[in-house]
């Protein structure tokens, strides 16, 4: 009897997991949602993330699908949004102006840590918003149905 019960519970858990996976990245309104995690100070990663965002946006536009993209930076990845250290600032400005569905988020905890270490707040692009914590933001986005990737 216990074996049957365990098998049934495992089956239900698998069914729930499969159903959840099938809808990841898509909201109930049909909007496709993509979050991109940037936590390393690597120009190649910055460019890959921007390529993914623009390619996803192009694909969604071609099919007529509604979409939202959020690029979340924290730890060393915050350098992507720093006006004094980012090698991709021109691309960020261009994407922000041409693809309004792309949003950039900077981790407030990382900003506070850099401020303490450097003696002044790091200059963050005007195209980014500040969130309390990058990891918490990714968890919130996951709860909202975003598909999260790390290039």
Model-derived regions, located:
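Bacterial/eukaryotic Sec-type N-terminal signal peptides
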Residues: 1-3, 16
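N-terminal export leaders
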Residues: 3-9
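Bacterial N-terminal signal peptides
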Residues: 10-19
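Secreted/extracellular ectodomain signature
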Residues: 23-151
């Amino acid at each position: 009897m216990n074996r049957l019960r365990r098998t049934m519970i495992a089956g239900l858990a698998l069914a729930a997991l499969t159903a959840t996976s099938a809808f990841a990245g898509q909201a109930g309104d049909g909007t496709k949602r993509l979050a991109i995690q940037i936590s390393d100070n690597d120009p190649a990663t910055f460019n890959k993330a921007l390529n993914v965002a623009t390619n996803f946006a192009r694909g969604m536009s071609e099919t007529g699908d509604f979409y939202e993209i959020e690029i979340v930076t924290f730890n060393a990845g915050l350098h992507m949004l720093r006006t004094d250290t980012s090698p991709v600032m021109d691309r960020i400005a261009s994407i922000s102006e041409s693809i309004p569905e792309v949003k950039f988020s900077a981790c407030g905890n990382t900003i506070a840590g850099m401020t303490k270490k450097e003696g002044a707040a790091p200059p963050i692009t005007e195209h980014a918003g500040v969130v309390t914590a990058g990891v918490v933001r990714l968890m919130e986005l996951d709860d909202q149905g975003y598909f999260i990737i790390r290039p």
